[in-house]
Amino acid sequence: DFQEKNENRPVIPVYIGIHTFHDTESRTTVIYDWRAPISSMFYDHELGEASYQSPSGEINGEISLKRQYRIQAGKMEFMIESALTVHDDILQKELSANADDKMKNIVATIQREQNRIIRNEEARTLIIQGVAGSGKTSIALHRIAYLLYTFQGSLSSNDILIISPNKVFADYISNVLPELGEETVPETSMEQILSEVLNHKYKYFSFFEQVNELLTKPTPDFIKRIEYKSSFDFIASLDRFILYIENHYFRAEDVKLTKHITVPAEFIEEQFPRFNRYPMRQRFEAMTDYILDMMKVQYAFTVTTAERNFLKKEIKRMFAGNNDLQVYKDFFAWMGKPELFKMRKNRILEYADIAPLAYLHIALKGGTKNYVKHLLVDEMQDYSPIQYKVMQKLFPCRKTVLGDTSQSVNPYGSSTADMIQKALIMGEIMKLCKSYRSTCEITEFAQQIRTNTELEPVARHGKKPQVLQFDNEKEELSAIKNLIVTHQASAYKSLGIVCKTETQACEMAEKLQIPDIHFLSNQSSAFVQGIVITSAHMAKGLEFDEVIIPQVDDKNYHSEIDRSMLYVAVTRAMHRLTLTYSGTKHTPFI
C-alpha cells in the first residue's frame, strides 16, 4: 500500500506480478508488471518513506503495508505480511525447495542489490562479479527482460545475443525469458563466433579439449603459450605488428594496363595510406576506382571491365597480408618468438591461437556485427583479454558481462573483472557477494578449498559435507551406489555425480551400471533432471539438490586447475554434499 506525498492523495494498493493486467472498462491497471517503475519500491524499500522514478520525475511517498502471496492453480498457497521479513521468509521457502531441470524466474525474491543491477540503464558495459550461487545468471536474464520492457520499440529479442559456455547451459536457462513474457534470445558460443570470423577455415582444439589437456597431460611449454597469449603484453605486440603490416606489407609495382598505358608503382604506393579509413584488405576496390578515375581525368581513358578487374587483382597481389595464418606466423617471427606458435598434428591449431588469429583478420578485413544491440556474456572468467578485444571489435554495442573469478576452469588464460574492464576500455563493475545456493555448511567447506573474503552466505543450515575414505576403488564404488539408493528414497529430485574430467565421468557411469543415470558430455545439448553424472567443467552454472564427488585423493586433485575443478564441483550442491576417495590420502585442498 502506497500513499504519495500529498495530503489529498489516497492510499492505493499496488499489486505486482509477472505481467501487467489492465482493466479496459475502468481503464486502470489492476496488476503492475514487476518491471514497471512503481514496482521498484517493493524491492528497494521497507515500510516507511519510499520513492520511485516515473517518466515524469521522482515520486515520493510512504509504504504502509507489504504483503506477498503465492497463488497456484487458483488456490492461495500462502500470504505473508510483515514489515521486514517478507523477502526473507519467501526467500527461505525458495532456497529450501528442490532444484529443477530448468532455471526459474526469481521475480518473487529479487533482492535489493540484485534489483540495482537489473534496472541499471546508465552503464554501457556492466561487469557483474558474482560469487558462486549469487544468482548472477538469473539476474542477467531478468536484466535483459527489464531492458526489453523498458525499451520496447527500440530493442527486441532479436537485437540481443547471449554468449554461453555450452549447449547444456543454454538449454538450462532457456525457460527464464519465456516465463517473464519475452521471446527467447539468440544464443551462441565463443567458438562459433571465432569460427565465423575466420570463415570456418581452420581446424582447432576446442576450449573443452584445451582444459582436458591441462587436466591430464599439461606441459610447461603448453602452459607458457596459453599464459602469454592471455596477456596484455601480447595484445600490445599484436597491435604494433598490425601497424607494421600497414607500413611494410604493401609493395607497389608498375602495372602495364594496356600496350600504351602503365600505372606507375609510385602512384599506386601513394594510394594505400590514402584509404586508411578502410581495413587493409578492403582498400583494393577503392584504390582501383580512384586510380582509374585519375587516369580518366588525365588521359581521357576509359577501361574495360576486364582491365579494371586485372588492375584490382594486381593491386591485391602487391599486399603480402592476404593469408591470415601466414601473417600470424610472421607475427611470431617478427617478435623473435617463433616457439610460441605451435600447430598440432594434421595442422590443428591450439585454442589459444584462434582469438588472436580472428583479431588479426578483423584488423585486416573488418567485420563489425551492428545488428546486435546488447551482448550478454556469461562465465566471463573463462575468456582471455584477447577474446574480449575480439568481442569489442565485433560488437560495438552495450554489454552485460558476468561471472566469478573463483570459478575459472581456464586458470592460465582467465580474466578478472578489472582485466575485462581494461580490455573493453570501459565498464562499470558491480558485485554480488551473497551466496544463496548452498547451505552454510557447504559454503564453509567450499571456502576451505578456495577462500573468497567477499562471499556472504545466506543463513540456511543443513548437514555437514561428508568426506568418506575407502581401502580400495571397489569399496568406494559400492558406497557411491548406496548413496544413490539413499538419494532415490529421499525427497530430493536431483543428484549430480561430478568427476574431475569427462573421461573419469564416462568410466564412472560404466562402472555404476545403474538405470536412469544421465551422462552429460560436452556433446550433450540438454540438461535433464534426476541423476546426472558429468565433469566439473560441464557442471559449471548448474545446481543439484545433492552432489557426490568421487576420487578426491591426492593424486587426482593436486594442481591449481584441479583446485578450480574441485571448487566448481563443491559449489554445485544446494542441500547435501559427499566426497569419496580410496587410498590413504585425500586431496590437500580439503
Regions found by a protein language model. Name each.
Residues 108-120:
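Pre-Walker A adenine-sensing motif
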